[in-house]
Amino acid sequence: MKAVILAGGLGTRLSEETIVKPKPMVEIGGKPILWHIMKMYSVHGIKDFIICCGYKGYVIKEYFANYFLHMSDVTFHMAENRMEVHHKRVEPWNVTLVDTGDSSMTGGRLKRVAEYVKDDEAFLFTYGDGVADLDIKATIDFHKAHGKKATLTATFPPGRFGALDIQAGQVRSFQEKPKGDGAMINGGFFVLNPSVIDLIDNDATTWEQEPLMTLAQQGELMAFEHPGFWQPMDTLRDKVYLEGLWEKGKAPWKTWE
């Protein structure tokens, strides 16, 4: 099964970083968050990726074109015009990079890659700026079992601030970012049948609006509930939080070795 990843947005709330790179190339632990997302899928056997490029898409192309350089130690023999790669690291991935336009909306980007998934029974779809400890295989099995056109992952949004456990005026413990108000939201990890792309009109279509609402009205949208870790990287605060988890060795989304 293929995974389509949106990677063309501006990331204006991370402008400190995105002035020189697209948002999915902002790094967590020295690796682009796009890489983390692909590793999340890869550990569940997903090897074929379609990346919807847009704003500064050349940065993503350069990264994959020189992937082994980014991931390996290298010696440059300058006088001999020769390069030696040490402990070459590779991934078992097939990565298709598609220019989906600088200003296309989320639905428009998906429509532009329709030819790459049209013959598949179903495909995975997500955004290039969020991580989770989601059981990808379970979402696929859920989608196949219910027989509807679309599955979204429903999750609890993280709280913005840590919480205090106070008993009789005494602080007993701290909780890092407890869950939000109890209502589940669209977590942005989808399993879709190719026919859903017919609901997208053009580049100006936002996937989260008319297409998803139409699927819901038709009774063709199911929710896979994920109560575990989920965190988007919308702001610098989010990036710092994710970076901290990674550096402490407590990144829940890291389910690979």
From Swiss-Prot:
Transmembrane segments: none annotated. Its EC number is 2.7.7.33. The keyword Iron does not apply. Its cofactor is Mg(2+). It catalyses: alpha-D-glucose 1-phosphate + CTP + H(+) = CDP-D-glucose + diphosphate. Pathway: Nucleotide-sugar biosynthesis; CDP-3,6-dideoxy-D-mannose biosynthesis; CDP-3,6-dideoxy-D-mannose from CTP and alpha-D-glucose 1-phosphate: step 1/5; Bacterial outer membrane biogenesis; LPS O-antigen biosynthesis. Binds 1 Mg(2+) ion per subunit. It is an enzyme of class 2 (transferase). Substrate binds at L6, A7, G8, G9, L10, G11, T12, R13, K23, S104, R109, G128. GO terms for molecular function: glucose-1-phosphate cytidylyltransferase activity; metal ion binding; nucleotide binding. Keywords: Lipopolysaccharide biosynthesis, Magnesium, Metal-binding, Nucleotide-binding, Nucleotidyltransferase, Transferase. SUPFAM superfamilies: Nucleotide-diphospho-sugar transferases (SSF53448). It comes from the Bacteria. Pfam families: NTP_transferase. Mg(2+) binds at D129, D234. GO terms for biological process: O antigen biosynthetic process. Catalysis proceeds via a sequential rather than a ping-pong bi-bi reaction mechanism. Belongs to the glucose-1-phosphate cytidylyltransferase family. Homohexamer. Involved in the biosynthesis of the tyvelose, a 3,6-dideoxyhexose found in the O-antigen of the surface lipopolysaccharides. It catalyzes the transfer of a CMP moiety from CTP to glucose 1-phosphate. This enzyme can utilize either CTP or UTP as the nucleotide donor. This is Glucose-1-phosphate cytidylyltransferase. The lineage of its organism: Bacteria, Pseudomonadati, Pseudomonadota, Gammaproteobacteria, Enterobacterales.
